[in-house]
Amino acid sequence: YILLDCPAGIEQGFMNAIAGADRAIIVTTPEVSAIRDADRIIGLLNSNQLKKMELIINRIRMDMVKRGDMMTVDDVTEILSIPLIGALPDDEQVVIGTNQGEPVIGLDSKAGMAYMNICKRIMGMDVPFMELQGSTGFFSKLSGLFKKD
């Protein structure tokens, strides 16, 4: 595997790097500017005939999703229209583990479990997605249509 962390400004180096790629995993956060950048990357990959693209959504904060201040996983996947292989909650245990030099995968945390599941999906295993949506799922949205202000 070759991993590229690409800035928003796509240059010739990016185009050279993807020339031999047969698969791309786009990692984004659920913020409007990041989604725009990811969409631009997807467009460039499509125009270069790279068809196998997958999505990881990073740093999801459920408190913000519940307040309506952050896009949901479903919102992001609907906008970008590529298969999701993982969603990572914004987990303070990641910061603590990183500061202590502990591997995130080994942490007993939601993020650690999400990372492990993503690794398994990359390797072709079929593993279920963790529930991150909380009360913002389908039935919650449906019931929200009937609430009076």
Tell me the role of every PLM-derived stretch:
Residues S33, M71, K110-M113, N117:
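Generic recognition of short, well-ordered alpha-helical interface segments
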